[in-house]
Amino acid sequence: MIDLWPAIDLINSTSVRLTEGKYDSKEKMEKSVEDSIRFYSQFKCVKRIHIVDLIGAKAKEVKEFDYIRSLRKLTTKPIEVGGGIRSKQTIENYIHSGIDYCIVGTKGIQDIEWLTHMTHQFPNKLYLSVDAFGEKIKINGWKEDAKLNLFDYVAKIEHLPLGGVIYTDISKDGKLSGPNFDLTGRLALYTSLPVIASGGIRHQEDLFRLESLNVHAAIVGKAAHLDEFWEGLS
């Protein structure tokens, strides 16, 4: 099966989910962050845990560093972190605290020279998060239009030693309506970088379909909080 990366989105050290990235749609999850990590860690199909500092993404600087660092001891699974990462120092701080991978978004999209430098400083440790409505890339916590096309932009960074590209269709995020198979599949064919699908994943059938499209991994948010999603998985 495709690699499975369950997501934990943080606001004030609490696990929440948003719909279409809108902060006023915040929904608190029943399981605590700690319980979620312990639960996900029991599954072999879970290859890493994806954590996002939502306030950090909005504030353009990391807000949950100490709390996220405290989570490292709860699992032996690799952890990747995103949200507000815009400096070499922040990346170093996370890596030195035991976080395995960092996700960069807005800064990397707006400043390819910086992204190039960082990927060579931390080869295969950085993932680029590209969030879009269709092919139109959004930045700064999905609030602003980057005025960039998804495919045009990925062509410019394809040669970099990134771990991969995380593509989120914002219109699907948090809705449990299925991912954007068309665009995600086209992107996986278009680039030699590993493509990670995010947004809208509902059930295991979605995972199998993404796998058939040569997608490397799937980030699962709201569905991962539903017991039925995990039925039959080990």
Swiss-Prot record:
Molecular function (Gene Ontology), one example: 1-(5-phosphoribosyl)-5-[(5-phosphoribosylamino)methylideneamino]imidazole-4-carboxamide isomerase activity
Keyword list, A-Z: Amino-acid biosynthesis, Cytoplasm, Histidine biosynthesis, Isomerase
Gene Ontology terms: biological process: L-histidine biosynthetic process; L-tryptophan biosynthetic process
Gene Ontology CC entries for this record: cytoplasm
Record-linked InterPro entries: Aldolase_TIM, His_biosynth, HisA_bact_arch, Isoase_HisA-like, Isoase_HisA-like_bact, RibuloseP-bd_barrel
Pfam families with a match to the protein in the record: His_biosynth (PF00977)
Pathway membership, UniProt: Amino-acid biosynthesis; L-histidine biosynthesis; L-histidine from 5-phospho-alpha-D-ribose 1-diphosphate: step 4/9
Subcellular location: Cytoplasm
Record keyword Isomerase present: yes
Enzyme Commission number: 5.3.1.16
SUPFAM superfamilies, per database record: Ribulose-phoshate binding barrel
Active-site residues, record numbering mapped to chain: D9 (proton acceptor), D131 (proton donor)
Major site of localization recorded for this protein: cytoplasm
Source organism superkingdom: Bacteria
Catalytic activity: 1-(5-phospho-beta-D-ribosyl)-5-[(5-phospho-beta-D-ribosylamino)methylideneamino]imidazole-4-carboxamide = 5-[(5-phospho-1-deoxy-D-ribulos-1-ylimino)methylamino]-1-(5-phospho-beta-D-ribosyl)imidazole-4-carboxamide
Family affiliation: Belongs to the HisA/HisF family.
Protein name: 1-(5-phosphoribosyl)-5-[(5-phosphoribosylamino)methylideneamino] imidazole-4-carboxamide isomerase
